[in-house]
Amino acid sequence: ARVALESCPRVRRCLVVDGGDAVRAFGDPRCVDFEAALAAQPDTPIADEWLGTPMLYSSGTTGRPKGILRPLPENPPSEPLPLFHFLNKLWQCRDGMRYLSPAPLYHSAPQANVALAIRNGGTVVIMEHFDPEAYLALVERHRITHTQLVPTMFSRLLKLPEAVRRRYDLSSLEFVVHAAAPCPVPVKEQMIDWWGPIIHEYYGATEGLGFTACNSQEWLAHRGTVGRVLAGKLHVFDDAMKELPLGTPGTLWFETATPFEYFNDPEKTAEARSGDG
């Protein structure tokens, strides 16, 4: 808490779990024991009891990360967002699941998957940084059932000596998903040979405009696919923004009813839209 307050002078309140006497000894009025702060809150519902939502930032693939601002959902806190139900079914989440996150939580995908696991009453294990053998050891030690990786992590796992790869029991794995970058066909073939047909893939963006997904069987039948469209409507345009026929290479655009804008950046917001909005 001391480091957080000294590093971020504009922070107005720092809640400390199990703070107690240490918080009082610290003497900074911004530093408050969590239990004391909770006890001071009224137990009556507030007038406008709607669920909030985080403002996620893009990963910065095309430049600096951009804040993605959406209208607040009109959901009471007791009801999960529709996206939760969608991903919960797609990712085969369940009570007692054990999720391993090898990626940082400032990215939307790991953050969403961690939240899904917690909301299902599951256990979450978070790596401070990815190490391929340490990852395998964590899967075995915690009997991990669900995890998400990126293709680079697949490649690093496959580069481990065969003896190291066989050293760990990975039989608890039920659902492995990857995204974020194109996965070379030989890499994915080797991963399916190693872990079995439990590897899923999706294509999307932090903006949440559209979503495609496929399982191992679908991918093996159409190697290189990122699956069928499950959210949004997909269009393929040429450089002149003319829609192209099926099977023609071009730029992918998603048509969606989900509004968003880039925080404090109307120019980037306009660039992200086609001429008809």
What is the meaning of each model-derived region?
Residues 4-55, 72-84, 160-161:
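ANL superfamily adenylate-forming
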Residues 66-70, 80-89, 99, 136-138, ...:
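Adenylate-forming
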Residues 228-229, 242-273:
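Conserved ATP/PPi-binding loop(s) of AMP-dependent carboxylate-activating enzymes
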Residues 55-70:
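Conserved adenylation A10 loop of the ANL superfamily
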Residues 73-98, 102, 106-146, 160:
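Conserved AMP-binding/adenylation subdomain of ANL enzymes
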Residues 2, 67-69, 123-129, 200:
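Short beta-strand->loop structural element characteristic of the AMP-binding/adenylate-forming
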Residues 133-136, 165, 270:
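Short hydrophobic/charged patches on amphipathic alpha-helices used for structural packing
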